[in-house]
Amino acid sequence: MTDTQLVARAQAGDLPAFEDLVKKYQREIYGLACRMVSDPEEAKDLAQQTFLQAFVHLRSFRQDAQFRTWIFRIAINQCYNFLKSRKRFGDPVDCDEVVLVGEDDTPEEELISQDERRRVYAALKKLPPKQQAVLTLKVDQGLSYQEISEVLGGTPGAARVNYCQALKTLKKYLRSEEDEVAMHPSPALATRVSRR
């Protein structure tokens, strides 16, 4: 069943139709929240709040918009409100433990991949919230610039500019971290290198 059909049924009072929408989007909404707030427990709460808000305001949803865009907008607003109220940008957490490593990777390759993910998440947390959101929506969720502009407001051109700025800033953070590591290697790394 399509989102349009599920929304129409849910707006008519069909609770199982809304539950189907929740099942369809819960992983994406949780992943988005987790990347924005860096706390798996808070992300779960924010995902639940997102679906609660969607349920409460479902009758005001207009079918001329996409449900996916609308629910992402609610999730982004929930995350922004959380970040504003708590004024915190915690340490990055690999929230949903999505395995990005191939099945044939060696333990060394898997360790490097996990370390790279942690570095990227740490750099991502340094970005302004809007750039975090644009990058997450584009890369993780695969939204187009048009869809991002519908979720965050603004134009597709502004979404593209924010995305490009976010990538540029992210690269700068990652390069500066690499330079820092090269200038001040960890004692464990220095010990491993000296043994060879």
PLM segments and residue spans:
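C-terminal edge and immediately downstream basic/flexible tail or linker adjoining helix-turn-helix-like DNA-binding
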Residues: 9, 91, 122, 146-153, ...
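Arg/Lys-rich amphipathic alpha helix in sigma70-family domain 2
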Residues: 59-63, 73-93, 113, 165
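Sigma70-family region 2
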Residues: 11-12, 38, 51-66, 85-87
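Structural recognition of an alpha-helix C-terminal capping motif at a helix-to-coil junction
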Residues: 31, 45-52, 65-77
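DNA-recognition helix of helix-turn-helix
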Residues: 69, 76, 80, 131, ...
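Amphipathic alpha-helical segment used for protein-protein interaction
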Residues: 8, 12-15, 87, 103-136, ...
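Internal acidic/polar
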Residues: 89-113, 188-191
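Short, charged helix-capping/linker segments at alpha-helix termini
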Residues: 11-20, 30-49, 156, 176-180
